[in-house]
């Protein structure tokens, strides 16, 4: 049963790749160029960015790496015939690219706000987990861990205002 099913799937993938070979090759070429360019850019400029604690550089490079990863997922989904799933990942790719461009355009303060919002997300997540730990049947964070995170959370709210506690 499984052998026959796998054989049918493999045959479909072979036909799909054969039918769309030129398009897949072009997409894969673009992905490789983007990945290698990003690696070289990071290798060349990372030392200076690290010495300057350039959070914009760090976030944009991370987003670029994430975008390359998502692009590879898209290629894999397309080759295997999952066009709708590939389109969903394409929307995620667009979101990552748009976020990186927004951070690059708006500079250091924007990058820091984005970067440190992880503390807000963590604190909110800790509270939710603690609240529902019995339903989840998974031990939530300790009171001490929550308190430690709350200190950082409160400092960020003081710095950026009450609205910073909201989801974006």
Which residue ranges define each predicted feature?
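Long, hydrophobic/aromatic-enriched structural stretches that serve as scaffold segments
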Residues: 37-103
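Secondary-shell segments that build the walls of catalytic and ion/ligand-binding clefts
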Residues: 1-52, 120-168
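Short, amphipathic alpha-helical segments
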Residues: 68, 87, 110, 140-143, ...
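Acidic/His-rich structured neighborhood in mature extracellular/periplasmic domains
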Residues: 103, 117-122
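Short, glycine/acidic-rich hinge or "gate" loops at secondary-structure transitions
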Residues: 86-87, 104-114
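Proteins with a high burden of low-complexity, intrinsically disordered sequence enriched in S/T/G/P/A and R
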Residues: 80-81, 111-113, 166-168
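Short amphipathic alpha-helical surface patches that mediate protein-protein
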Residues: 91-94, 115-119
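Short, solvent-exposed helix-helix connector turns and helix-capping sites enriched
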Residues: 20, 82, 106-107
């Amino acid at each position: 049963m499984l052998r026959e099913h796998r054989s049918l799937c493999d045959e479909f993938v072979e036909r799909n790749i054969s039918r769309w070979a030129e398009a897949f090759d072009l997409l894969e070429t673009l992905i490789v160029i983007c990945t290698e360019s990003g690696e070289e850019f990071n290798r060349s400029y990372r030392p200076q960015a690290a010495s300057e604690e350039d959070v914009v550089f760090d976030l944009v490079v991370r987003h670029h790496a994430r975008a390359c990863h998502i692009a590879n997922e898209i290629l894999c989904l397309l080759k295997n015939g999952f066009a709708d799933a590939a389109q969903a990942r394409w929307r995620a790719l667009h979101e990552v690219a748009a976020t990186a461009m927004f951070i690059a355009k708006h500079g250091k303060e924007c990058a820091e706000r984005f970067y440190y919002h992880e503390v807000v997300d963590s604190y909110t997540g800790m509270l939710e987990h603690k609240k529902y730990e019995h339903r989840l049947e998974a031990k939530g964070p300790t009171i001490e861990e929550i308190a430690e995170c709350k200190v950082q959370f409160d400092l960020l709210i003081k710095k950026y205002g009450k609205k910073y506690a909201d989801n974006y």
